[in-house]
């Protein structure tokens, strides 16, 4: 009798994980509500023809900076030797109809997903360009950006933040007397990075 009871208990316990696994849905959905997203755009306007001469924009989610990131060990563990999504939720996107030169590298007009890569020693940061077609083909979410093949990178310079950015802030600034020379700025908490952009645009 004891053997039968023990066998019954064993079978019952063995079935519990299988039942739990069967009750878990194989597919779930997230999102659907408006996200907190930002957009930095530079538009060139031909005043003679009264029409656009070209433009480029970076669209991105705005994650909130957390005080825990100010712990150097924690921040290094998150970023050293890794590519960060540089945003939240959907991919950060560069959409340009103009040829650009970013940190000295030619970037053809087109559509790119962006990330930030930090070197293994933590001394260098670079802007990572990812082919959206390859991401779509592999169904990769920005959360898993380190699974996405990086097409190329351009260096970014570390800057001193004027103030702590509570949310990720990406800006494109330019002097009024030289509008083809644009500075890309990425600010998040105590992190501040910049890269020069030269824009090719006809009058």
Where does each model-flagged region fall?
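Positively charged n-region of N-terminal signal peptides that target proteins for export
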Residues: 1-5
């Amino acid at each position: 009798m004891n053997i039968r009871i023990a066998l019954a208990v064993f079978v019952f316990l063995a079935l519990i994980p299988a039942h739990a696994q069967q009750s878990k849905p194989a597919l779930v959905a997230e999102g659907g509500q408006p996200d907190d997203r930002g957009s930095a755009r530079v538009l060139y306007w031909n005043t003679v023809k009264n029409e656009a001469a070209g433009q480029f924009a970076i669209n991105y989610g705005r994650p909130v900076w957390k005080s825990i990131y100010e712990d150097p060990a924690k921040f290094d563990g998150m970023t050293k030797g890794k590519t960060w999504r540089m945003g939240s939720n959907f991919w950060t996107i560069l959409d340009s109809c103009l040829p650009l030169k970013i940190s000295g590298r030619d970037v053809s007009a087109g559509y790119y997903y962006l990330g930030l890569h930090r070197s293994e020693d933590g001394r260098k940061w670079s802007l990572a360009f990812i082919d959206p077609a390859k991401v779509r083909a592999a169904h990769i979410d920005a959360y898993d950006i380190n699974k996405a093949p990086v097409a190329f990178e351009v260096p970014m310079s570390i800057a001193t933040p004027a103030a702590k950015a509570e949310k990720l802030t990406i800006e494109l600034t330019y002097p009024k007397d030289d509008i083809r020379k644009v500075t890309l700025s990425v600010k998040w908490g105590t992190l501040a990075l910049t890269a020069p952009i030269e824009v090719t645009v006809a009058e």
